[in-house]
A protein has these predicted regions:
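N-terminal active-site segment of His-dependent metallophosphoesterases
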Residues: 44-50, 55-74, 79-99, 112-115, ...
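Active-site neighborhood of phospho(di)ester-bond hydrolases with catalytic His/Asp-centered motifs
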Residues: 159-161, 185-189, 219-225, 305-307, ...
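N-terminal secretory signal peptides
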Residues: 1-8, 22-26, 34-35
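Binuclear metal-dependent phosphoesterase catalytic core
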Residues: 43-66, 73-77, 248, 348, ...
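Short S/T/G- and acidic-enriched coil/turn segments that sit immediately N-terminal to beta-strands
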Residues: 100-104
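Extended active-site neighborhood of metal-dependent phosphoesterases/phosphodiesterases
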Residues: 106, 117-147, 199-297, 326-335, ...
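Short acidic, glycine-rich surface-loop motifs adjacent to enzyme active sites
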Residues: 295-315
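Short, flexible loop/turn segments at beta-strand junctions in immunoglobulin-like
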Residues: 107-111
Length: 403
């Protein structure tokens, strides 16, 4: 595999981010002393963040929110703001409905193309005794969303990547999107430097998303290698509907999302023998091979794969090399129309190259001003287009594919 400059650039970035700690990272971390937000009994019951929407379509929508104390929660919804006559709860396990602070309620069997109004409701659990449950304050918040028709003719979405604990970049880059019309926002990994605690997740991603779009437009999120790091990395997935692999259809596109894992070898001393990403990628490759044989994949006018570490052109570290070994042969055989990635911190468009990638590959930029990008993807049955812009709004790359 060819050796490129991106790996060294990433190392320089990481060194720089440590030096910047006092200004950009250490201050937030200093306020994140506890790994879970502990709330004293004197604090009023409330919503810490949310609601925020996530989905992989198929006439379902997940509504998530976090309360500052344990609660029983549900969603009331309907096609009119004055008639929220439907009710949904979080997934029951072993006959028990959820009771806690992290809430995820999935609305199912929604009507295609219909606007839904919803209200999240949480009822504080003041005292939980074996035969007596005492409730306290009830709180709520409202929102609306359109349930996208999976068979719609035209789709559009926006990709962001490699934000690296710079929360102001999220609304800044979204604001540059002139059309402001997206079926979803896609976060392609490394939104954080590493996982510290709940406050970091709220302050550096969830709250900026809620403020900008996430109460009415869903986002989809896959981990980058940095989300696999830090003391809170094992708790991190509970704050989202999904941060791993997925496959779904929207309009003329079959989407496949791969979780590329860590870029260091599993035996690296910093992981102390508690990771297994090589096997994880191998298992995903088997899953990908099965997905590529599915009718949904084969019959789609376009096939788009989204993965944080690119299948090539990202240096010679262990993770990128392993991604090339296990994923690229499948991508080349599977008639993939476009791959969207990040990781290198250097934006680039790689057109198909004989003996390498049979598909166009867009790699988004980095976290620093002047390197940040957003990528706008649109598709109908005749054309798939992806245009990458830098943080001045200037076009810096384009791919157009026809069936």
């Amino acid at each position: 595999m060819e050796k490129n400059h991106p790996q060294q650039q990433r190392r320089n970035f990481l060194k720089g981010s440590l030096a910047l700690g006092a200004a950009t990272l250490m201050a937030p971390v200093a306020t994140m002393a506890s790994s879970t937000i502990a709330k004293g009994s004197e604090e009023a019951f409330g919503i810490s963040v949310g609601p925020y929407l996530q989905t992989t379509f198929g006439n379902e929508m997940s509504i998530l929110w976090i309360t500052n104390k344990n609660a029983a929660s549900w969603v009331e919804y309907g096609e009119s703001a004055d008639a929220l006559n439907l009710k949904a709860y979080g997934e029951s396990k072993l006959g028990l409905r959820p009771e806690g602070r992290l809430n995820c309620v999935t609305l199912k069997n929604l009507k295609p193309g219909v606007t839904y109004h919803y209200k999240i409701v949480s009822k504080e659990v003041v005292d939980f005794q074996p035969y007596k449950l005492t409730y306290g304050t009830v709180i709520s918040d409202t929102g609306t969303f359109v349930n996208a028709d999976s068979a719609k003719e035209h789709i559009s979405f926006l990709m962001l990547n490699d934000i690296h604990d710079r929360p102001k970049s999220i609304p800044f880059l979204l604001e540059l999107d002139k059309e402001k019309k997206n079926d979803f926002i896609f976060f392609n990994g490394d939104i954080f430097d590493y996982q510290t605690d709940e406050k970091q997740i709220i302050d550096h991603m969830l709250q900026p998303c809620v403020d900008a779009f996430a109460k009415q437009t869903p986002f989809i999120y896959v981990r980058g290698n940095h989300e696999t790091r830090g003391k809170f990395c094992r708790e991190f997935p509970a704050y989202f509907q999904n941060v791993g692999r997925a496959a779904f259809t929207l309009g003329p596109v079959r989407f496949v999302i791969l979780d590329t894992g860590e870029d260091k070898e599993d035996a690296h001393p910093v992981y102390a023998g508690i990771v297994d990403f090589d096997q994880y990628r191998i298992e995903q490759a088997k899953w990908l091979a099965t997905e590529m044989q599915s009718k949904a994949f084969k019959k789609a006018p376009f096939r788009v794969v989204m993965m944080h570490i690119p299948p090539r052109y990202s240096g010679d570290a262990h993770g990128p090399v392993h991604c090339t070994e296990v994923f690229e042969p499948l991508l080349n055989k599977g008639k993939v129309d476009l791959v969207l990635s990040g990781h290198t911190h250097k934006y680039m468009v790689h057109q198909p190259a004989q003996g390498k990638n049979n598909y166009p590959l867009i790699i988004g930029g980095g976290p620093k001003e002047g390197t940040r990008t957003y990528t706008k993807i649109k598709a109908n049955r005749q054309l798939l287009s992806a245009v990458m812009f830098d943080d001045s709004g200037k076009e810096v790359g384009r791919v157009e594919v026809r069936p």
